[in-house]
Amino acid sequence: MGGRHSDRFAGRTVLVTGGGAGIGAATAHRLADEGAAVVILDNEEEGGHRTARQITASGARAAFVLGDVTDEPAWTRAVRTAHDGFGSLDGLVSNAGLMRPGPADALSLSDWEGQLGVNLTGAFLGVRACLEDLRARRGAIVLTSSVHALIGLPARPAYAATKAGLTGLGRQLAVDYGPVVRVNCVLPGPILTRAWEEVAEEDLRLTIEQTVAGRHGHPDEVAAAIAFLLSDDASYVTGTSLVVDGGWSVYKTSV
């Protein structure tokens, strides 16, 4: 946000889901700062429009598509917007996510299915909608998973299952569509997004104490990792998961 990092995405278009806030918004800004045209797909109209307006005000290119990642026609509209507005589609960042905590015996079926739909089925639908273009352009995909795919935390069965599923999906897609399309996952840890605004101050303090870096991460830091995985700098990186958690999962598994 605010200042060109490089031009390594010049002439490319990237579709980012959940780009209205948090990691998605930071990623959209980062890619635009590096020369990409960005299509934002989000079901929150205000946030999606805000990100697109901020990018275009900076002199970069962006478009917003209102829609839910679980809705196939929304994906069709987003891909069409990339074609009509920017002439190509070169990358996909499947970032939209949903977490509704609760242990398995207290989690409703609708909450389970809701998280499965957004976190996993939404990514599948996006990949399917974008693959023809990405194969033609030798593009790249980044799926936003979570350290919850690696470690267990209380009352997160649906979220953990879907995020672990994303890492498996990423590996499989890399095998099925390489060497033409690269597919990787990014696994954020304790990142200061909107979800953390409701966390008690004591819990925030404990999280910092249990993080090797000694602090929470910021959406811009995850966006930098996503930009790397999408870029030609990662041309020999596919089928892997990049953990961006300040060493939190290392600490949790070493004590």
Q: Where are the model-predicted features located?
A:
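Short C-terminal tail/terminal secondary-structure segment
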Residues: 2-5, 151, 227, 238-255
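Short, small/polar-rich loop/turn modules that mediate ligand/substrate recognition or access, typified
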Residues: 93, 178-182, 237-239
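Substrate-binding pocket helix/loop in short-chain dehydrogenase/reductase
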Residues: 103-104, 108-116, 196, 204-207
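Active-site helix of classical SDR
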Residues: 127, 162, 170
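Alpha-helical segment proximal to the catalytic Tyr-Lys
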Residues: 132, 174-179, 235
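Residue(s) in the substrate-gating loop at a strand-loop-helix junction
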Residues: 146
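A conserved structural motif in NAD(P)-dependent oxidoreductases
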Residues: 211-222
